[in-house]
């Protein structure tokens, strides 16, 4: 393929996953396979193809290290029913798209086990934190993880029945085997292959991911879905994650000190 594609031709990547074995993102796999740097833009976000085909309002993200290329993709694909935001945070966009598929399987398992809405909310919240921990370790920006390709895609994939990954989880929770499920599906559920790669990546960077790791263990047949949920519920109780809030009374703090304090907090949150 590298002999056919011009080195200056931009490539558009729509894949959401990590390479099995290497745990590489597609933006890393493509230049490695081509044995050269290639202009690349990643297109990702909360999208079901059937709704795009129906012309329903949709928002996605075009991410490229080359900001001009991201804007070019934005101008090519943006329309009255498709809003395209741009980003230079390729890592954040790709990692969100890959990890949310694994979390969607977990959400489906909770649905299949009929554990209720409280459990669903708690699990997805924990999963969002785990995505933030690992993606942040790799350099993803917090605003990307909170945007369309992060929170937006998580909400769509975890809570809507059209999601293939959620469907796999739901059927696993209902008692079907993975072989039965995959054998009856005409489409690919990316989270199945990605789960193991996520665990491998987490180990490499020493990040604890209880929920996403549990999904990988369930898919590998190492643990029953109900037992996995019980194990997660019996993890040590921990403080809730919170954001620092500053209350400033008029004339109590010099402006320069306030600016310095805010900068310190922002730097701390990025560490």
Which residue stretches match the model-derived regions?
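Rossmann-like NAD(P)(H) cofactor-binding subdomain of soluble oxidoreductases
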Residues: 1-55, 73-75
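Internal alpha-helical scaffold of NAD(P)-dependent oxidoreductase catalytic cores
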Residues: 4, 29-39, 57-144
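General beta-strand structural signal in soluble alpha/beta enzymes
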Residues: 13, 38-44, 84-88, 147, ...
């Amino acid at each position: 393929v590298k002999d056919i594609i011009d080195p200056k031709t931009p490539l558009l990547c729509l894949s959401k996953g990590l390479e099995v074995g290497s745990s590489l993102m597609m933006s890393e796999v493509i230049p490695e396979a081509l044995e050269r740097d290639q202009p690349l833009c990643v297109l990702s976000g909360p999208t079901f193809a059937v709704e795009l085909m129906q012309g329903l309002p949709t928002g996605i993200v075009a991410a490229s290290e080359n900001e001009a290329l991201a804007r070019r993709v934005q101008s090519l694909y943006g329309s009255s029913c498709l809003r395209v935001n741009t980003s230079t945070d390729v890592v954040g966009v790709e990692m969100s798209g890959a990890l949310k598929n694994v979390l969607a399987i977990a959400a489906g398992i909770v649905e299949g086990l009929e554990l209720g809405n409280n459990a669903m909310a708690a699990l997805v919240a924990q999963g969002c934190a785990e995505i933030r921990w690992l993606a942040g370790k790799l350099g993803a920006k917090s605003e990307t993880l909170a945007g369309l390709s992060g929170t937006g895609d998580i909400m769509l994939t975890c809570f809507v029945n059209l999601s293939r990954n959620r469907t796999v989880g739901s059927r696993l929770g209902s008692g079907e085997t993975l072989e039965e499920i995959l054998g009856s599906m005409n489409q690919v559920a990316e989270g199945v292959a990605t789960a193991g790669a996520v665990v491998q990546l987490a180990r490499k960077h020493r990040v604890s991911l209880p929920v996403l790791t549990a999904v990988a263990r369930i898919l590998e047949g190492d643990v029953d879905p109900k037992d996995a949920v019980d194990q997660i519920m019996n993890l040590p109780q921990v403080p809730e994650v919170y954001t620092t809030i500053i209350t400033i009374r008029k004339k109590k703090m010099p402006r320069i000190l306030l600016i310095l304090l805010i900068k310190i907090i922002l730097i701390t949150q990025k560490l």
